[in-house]
Every structure is written in structure tokens, then in C-alpha cells.
Amino acid sequence: MYLLDTNVISETRRPNRMHHNVRAWLEQTGPESLYTSVIVMMELERGVLGMERKDPAQGAILREWLEQVIKPAFNGRILPIDEATAGICARLHIPDRAPENDSWIAATAKQYGLT
């Protein structure tokens, strides 16, 4: 089972322009094996909000994609963060600090035994 990061989910937005390796991997991996994190959902939401402010027409397209495609596709498979996740995340910063959101996503994957 896999935890998808923002870049993989974003790649699915335009199926006709999706990288062929991503397409092949997604086609051979059943959707029931794909999870994501609340941190990824926050990053996607932040991107949509930014686009809605910058370019309302494109923002509306992204909003529809997020609400009508992504959220339903991951219904029941958006993993939360909790105190256990926080402990795992903190350990990922020692001895060297790591990017915050990436650390939360990695900690979530580790907590749930996902790749």
C-alpha cells in the first residue's frame, strides 16, 4: 500500500498529459492500495486557494477537480496525523532538520506501514 504525495496526485489532474510512468504505475496499482495524508490535502487546498485568488477561472477548474475528483477518490483513505505521528515526525528531524510537510507525510507513511 502507498501514500501518495502532492506531486503524484497533481500529476493526475490532466490525464492526457500525465507522465507515462505515472500512468502505468497507477493502472497496475489498484485504487484501494492508494492513500494520502491530511498534509497532502492541505497542500492541495493551499494551491487551489492561491489559484482562485490569482486566476479565478483556473481556480474554479482546480476547485472542481479537488472537490469532485480527488476527495471522492480518496474517501476513507485520507490519513490523519496524531500524537504518534508527531513523535515519528520529530525523530525524522534528528540529527538534521528536514522539510516540515515532507516530514509529516513520511511520518504518516511510516506510522501506517505504507510506502
What are these regions (language model features)?
Residues 9, 41-45, 86:
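Alpha-helix N-cap/helix-start and coil->helix boundary motif
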Residues 46-49, 60, 71-115:
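Active-site neighborhoods of divalent-metal-dependent phosphate/nucleic-acid chemistry enzymes
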